[in-house]
């Protein structure tokens, strides 16, 4: 097991990539704190982990708020004694250009996607430093590396995540903390389906457009979880500050 005796805290762990990663990390031996806003979905993930013989707890968190992020870290340590891996996977996506983007959409996107990663890291880093190290993984995006149509607020937030990753990697390497970013392309998640709806585009057409990429399809949450596992394991022991693109060749 690649994560035996490790403790992982995963935000956005109730659906999509976060859910798949929670389940995979547990299968690889980690104790998992599943964090998210939807209690019912979170408890379902925890029950699935426990039924398979793993250990998990659900922690209700809205990553926009400092007090909730601090409490989430504290509850994880109370439950499992430490935090070895933080995966900041909570995210939102709005289809907008700058003129179309409302201030509410802009603020929500930056607050969840970027500020949430900052806050969770802020309260986790002292724990990791005190225990001699740890691993932080941010969920970025291919659209944090290149521009995307009608995704202004999302691109801005994910570009910030990529640069935050690099800055944190420099600041905390000597504390034994590695910081990397996973950058998925389009993935078959509820967020992607919702994005298609916001663009008034049938999901089948969305899939047809995705087929132009070299591999001719969108990704699955399990595929992104597997790449995230690599970043969370000793297999990536000499990697920090990296953005790992997993997108079927979309930005190649």
Regions found by a protein language model. Name each.
Residues 7, 14-15, 38:
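Conserved glycine-rich cofactor-binding loop
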Residues 141:
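Residue(s) in the substrate-gating loop at a strand-loop-helix junction
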Residues 97-98, 102-110, 209:
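Substrate-binding pocket helix/loop in short-chain dehydrogenase/reductase
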Residues 87, 173, 178, 239-241:
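Short, small/polar-rich loop/turn modules that mediate ligand/substrate recognition or access, typified
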Residues 121, 157, 165:
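Active-site helix of classical SDR
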Residues 2, 80, 118, 133, ...:
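C-terminal substrate-recognition "lid" of short-chain dehydrogenase/reductases
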Residues 126, 170-174, 237:
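Alpha-helical segment proximal to the catalytic Tyr-Lys
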């Amino acid at each position: 097991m690649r994560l035996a005796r490790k403790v992982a805290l995963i935000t956005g762990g109730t659906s999509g990539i976060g859910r798949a990663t929670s389940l995979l990390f547990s299968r690889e031996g980690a104790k998992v704190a599943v964090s998210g806003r939807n209690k019912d979905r979170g408890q379902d993930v925890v029950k699935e982990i426990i039924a398979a013989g793993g250990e998990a707890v659900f922690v209700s968190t809205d990553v926009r708020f400092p007090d909730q992020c601090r409490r989430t870290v504290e509850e994880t340590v109370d439950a499992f004694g430490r935090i070895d891996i933080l995966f900041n996977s909570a995210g939102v996506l709005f289809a907008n250009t700058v003129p179309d983007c409302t201030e509410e959409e802009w603020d929500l996107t930056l607050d969840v996607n970027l500020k949430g990663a900052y806050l969770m890291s802020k309260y986790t880093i002292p724990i990791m430093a005190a225990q001699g190290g740890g691993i932080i993984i941010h969920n970025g995006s291919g659209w944090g590396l290149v521009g995307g149509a009608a995704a202004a607020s999302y691109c801005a937030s994910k570009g910030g995540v990529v640069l935050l990753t690099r800055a944190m990697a420099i600041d905390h390497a000597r504390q034994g903390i590695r910081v990397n970013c996973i950058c998925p392309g389009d993935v078959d998640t509820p967020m992607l389906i919702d994005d298609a709806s916001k663009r008034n585009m049938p999901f089948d057409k969305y899939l047809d457009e995705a087929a132009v990429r070299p591999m001719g399809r969108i990704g699955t949450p399990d595929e992104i979880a597997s790449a995230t596992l690599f970043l969370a394991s000793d297999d990536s022991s000499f990697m920090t500050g990296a953005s790992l693109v997993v997108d079927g060749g979309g930005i190649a």
